């Protein structure tokens, strides 16, 4: 990944690497949940929410690969995935889950939300870095 990003500012490279690692971690989590649960990891969730979480087994690695390749589509997909994941986790942990107080899911939701906000803060820099590469590749 570093070769494609070597001309980007250090902070932007760090944000890109961190986002790729978060997306890779998300991929592992969703694949493990799918494997351990025998194909139905979220039986208590509404169908639309189960479908969304299952789709992350494809969307997380796709966003990571596109972002690692310094593609603007990777930035857009990573933002869409992480922001929607924060919203979906909020729904699952605060609307669907009737438990009062702190739960592991609610702590996880808070962490996903912090990561999504961090990515939103980094998005302008990531966007500029991917735009400059796009301009360079069209001039060749």
Which residue stretches match the model-derived regions?
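Topology signature of small-to-medium multi-pass alpha-helical membrane proteins
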Residues: 1-140
